[in-house]
Amino acid sequence: MSEHGMISRELCKPDSAFAELEKAKSAWRKEVLKLGFGGNVPFAHYVNGWAVYQTLACRLMGRCSVYQSGGAIGFRDQLQDAVNLLLISPTPARRQILDCCAHQYLEGDVMHWWHAMPDGDRGVRTRCSDDMLWLVWALCEYVEKTGDTDICSEAVYYVNSSPLEGSETDRYEMPQRSSVSTSVLDHAKAAVDCCANRGVGMHGLLLFGSGDWNDGMNNIDGEGVWLSWFFAHTVRRFADLLVMLCKQGSDHYRALAASCGTAADRAWDGSWYLRGYWSDGEPIGSKNDG
């Protein structure tokens, strides 16, 4: 009988099964009960255990949710999940930042999601406008929370494929690893530059592309307020990181951030901020919409 068969037979015995279950519970308790948020209230139980368990088991390990069970590694998704665990352990965030750098194209855009396959990773190249910025955000969060600046100098290869053509909104592919590697900091610069170089619309806001965090807004073809906010917030922090590392370029990036932030502030509609603008200049999410 194979080793797996012997293990299966042993676990069919109730005593053995219950003993292994308790071992698994004990291991998970050690992993997730690290915050020590005070109080015997439901919120404390959620934060101290279940939120961490869900992030680790469901999001990072299982890569699934109640509405999405494809098992792919999402560029923005797993960066957000891993950064949320920084108070528990910095390891997932560090690992995810490096992995996402390895799924960035030479042009600065990134794979929206991918499946890790034995013969090479397969995924989609898109025109989503926010994906690459999450790498910059995650790097700033990681360095700020851990003080580990060494990650900024780690060298990581890019991936390479033909850029999307004019009529292509996305492409499923297996890109090749390029011969070019740069520091994580330069990967972050490439991400900011890629987003900025796509330009702004008539209101000075960054362009939606094929979705700016809200993937359902893939046919707007206009300008995004949220995206411009996120760019301003993230790039301002990136400029601060450059100063901390004694690197050049902080003034340039601070000016880019200020320009986007100012344009986004002008999107105030009297009661709330607009969501964006269609390509013809019509507002999205106005208080005057029916």
List where the protein language model places each region.
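Acidic/polar, glycine-enriched structural segments that form the non-catalytic walls/loops
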Residues: 1-72, 162-178, 241-243, 248-255, ...
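Structured mid-domain segments that build the active-site/substrate or prosthetic-cofactor binding neighborhood
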Residues: 1-4, 211, 219, 233
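Short, glycine/acidic-rich hinge or "gate" loops at secondary-structure transitions
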Residues: 5-10, 149-158, 246-253, 271-277
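Aromatic-rich carbohydrate-recognition surfaces in CAZymes
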Residues: 17, 82-93, 97-202, 225-232
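Active-site-adjacent bridging/hinge elements
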Residues: 49-63, 103-115, 199-214, 271-283
